[in-house]
Amino acid sequence: GDKVLVQTPVYNCFFSSIRNDGCVAEYNHLRYEDGVYTIDFEDLECKAADPSVKLMLLCNPHNPAGRVWSREELEKIADICLRNGVFVVADEIHCELVYPGHRYTPFASLSEEALLHSVTCISPSKAFNLAGIQIANIVAADEEVRKKIDRAINVNEVCDVNSFAVDALVAAYGEGEEWLEELKRYLYGNYET
């Protein structure tokens, strides 16, 4: 089957999703140096050049490493993937939970090419503690990609969302900013101690 690049350690559901789609995980292991995870770009370049690698599941910010990838790091990933025809699925579900001194950069914001050769997955489930409502957004600029996503979620019957979930999503994003800022202060306080 086709190969999907993942940067380990990573959220365990990535692996079951890859297997369930008949694909094989290709590992770009993150390096752990002096208490910080970094990307092995030489290894990423080598693995992305394999014609059987079709997709990269990018976790940005990274879970569980806690790294908020810099714009420069993301630009290197984009360059490697674009040159090798590797499509990027950016799991950016933790994007609202960034501590002071770090800046989250959406992968799709890097360039027009990155926008058209990626999809972004976000959800209020982590930042607003709404995992139980099981709702997320998949953002794709390319019309053909949106059609493929629509077919895939309908085949897997994950498209039916209850009305409570929609209301919760709208309330979280529309009225939850004050609560989210308080949560981030609380979490950062725990992190500092």
Locations of regions flagged by a protein language model:
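PLP-dependent aminotransferase class I/II
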Residues: H117-T193
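Short beta->alpha connector loops at strand-helix junctions that form conserved
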Residues: T8, Y27-Y32
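A short helix->loop->beta-strand "cap" motif at the edges of active sites that frequently abuts
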Residues: C23, R83-F87, L115-L116
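A short helix-loop-beta submotif of the ANL/AMP-binding
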Residues: N20-E26
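Conserved PLP-anchoring active-site segment centered on the Schiff-base-forming lysine
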Residues: G1-I18
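Hydrophobic/aromatic ligand-binding patch that stacks against planar heteroaromatic rings
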Residues: S16-S17, I80, L110
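Active-site phosphate-binding strand-loop segment of PLP-dependent enzymes
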Residues: L30-H102
